[in-house]
Amino acid sequence: MEAKPLASSSSEPNMISPSSNIKPKLKDEDYMELVCENGQILAKIRRPKNNGSFQKQRRQSLLDLYETEYSEGFKKNIKILGDTQVVPVSQSKPQQDKETNEQMNNNKKKLKSSKIEFERNVSKSNKCVESSTLIDVSAKGPKNVEVTTAPPDEQSAAVGRSTELYFASSSKFSRGTSRDLSCCSLKRKYGDIEEEESTYLSNNSDDESDDAKTQVHARTRKPVTKRKRSTEVHKLYERKRRDEFNKKMRALQDLLPNCYKDDKASLLDEAIKYMRTLQLQVQMMSMGNGLIRPPTMLPMGHYSPMGLGMHMGAAATPTSIPQFLPMNVQATGFPGMNNAPPQMLSFLNHPSGLIPNTPIFSPLENCSQPFVVPSCVSQTQATSFTQFPKSASASNLEDAMQYRGSNGFSYYRSPN
C-alpha cells in the first residue's frame, strides 16, 4: 500500500467544510487520509483518475462518516427484523389470547364444580356422623355425650353456623323425650364450659392484678413503716427526756426560797444567785469565828454554816448546801469580794432580808460566844478544839499556830 502523507490545510484548496451536506460513501478502490484541523479530525479520500493520478477530496468528520455509513445499514436491518417478527406475531396473538382465555375459564369452572362437590360431600359426612352419634347417645346414656361436644370441621360450610343448627338436625331424628333431653343437656354443658372458661380467665386476670397490687404495696410499705417506727421511737424518747427535765426543775424550784417563777431561764438565774450568796455567807462566818482554813475542800454536807456559834437562826437546810465548797481564804481580805456584784453584798447591811431572824453581823468584832462544835465531830474529838480569846484581832489571827486534831482536819488555836 502507498504511504499516507499528511498535508497541511494551506496546501489543499479543494476542502469541504464540515457543515456541507455532501456525504459520499467510501469504496474499496478509494484511499482515505485523516487530517486534524481546528480540533476536528477530517477524512481525505484519494481517487485514481483515468491518467493514473489521484484526485484529492475532503470529507466530513469521522462521526459524520460513522453516522452516514452505519445508520442506513442499521435501519435496513431493523426493518428486516421487524418485518420478520411482527408479521407472524400479529397473526398469532389473537389466537393465543383466545386459547388462554378459554383455558382459564375452563379451569375456573372445574375448580368451582370441585369445590361444590367437596362441600356437599363434607356436609353429608357431617350429617351422617351427627345422626350416628345421637343414636348412640340415646342408646348408651348421657355419660358419653361429652365426646360429641366438639364443633364441626373448619373446612365444612357449617363452620359459621351456631351450635343451634348442630343440635337442630339431631332433633329431627329424635322420636322420644330422651333424645330431646340429651340435646338440652348438651347445650347446657357447652354453655357451662364457656362460662367456666370465661370465669377462669377473669379470675386469672383478677389474681394477676391483685398480685401486682400486693407486690407494689409490699415494696412501698417497707420504707413507710420504718419511718413511722423511727418517728414514734424518737417521740417517746423526747417525752421521757422532757419529763425528767421538768422533775429536776421542780426540785430546784422547791429548794430556792421565795421563788415562784415558772420560766426555766429565770429559775436558773435565781439558783445561780442564791448559790453565790451562800458561798459569801460561809466565807464571812468563817472569818468572824476566827477559823482561818487553808485552800482545801471541806465537807459541808452534815451541818449548816449558820450554826458556827453566832446564835444566828439557821434558815438554810442541810440539803441546800453543796457537799464541797472552795474556801480560799487570804490574810489581806475576803476571797471573791472584789469581783462580787453589789447585789451579792447587800446582806452585810440587810442580812435579815435574805435569811430571817438573823441579827446584824460584823466579822471583825470580838466573839464572846462559845465555839459550837459541828454535829459531824464526836465529843471525844471536841475536847481538842480551843476557843480564841475575846481580844482576838486580825494580827492575832495571822500569828496563830496550826493545830491538827485527831480527826484529820486542820484547825487553829491561839499561842496561849
UniProtKB/Swiss-Prot annotation:
SMART domains from the UniProt entry: HLH
Disulfide bond is among the record's keywords: no
Keywords, alphabetical: Coiled coil, DNA-binding, Nucleus, Transcription, Transcription regulation
Lineage, top ranks: Eukaryota, Viridiplantae, Streptophyta, Embryophyta, Tracheophyta
Subunit comment: Homodimer. Interacts with APRR1/TOC1. Associates to PTAC12/HMR/PAP5 which acts as a transcriptional coactivator.
One example of a Gene Ontology biological process annotation: shade avoidance
Record-level Gene Ontology MF annotations: DNA binding; DNA-binding transcription factor activity; protein dimerization activity
PANTHER family in alphabetical order: TRANSCRIPTION FACTOR PIF3
Gene3D superfamilies in UniProt: Helix-loop-helix DNA-binding domain
Record protein name field: Transcription factor PIL1
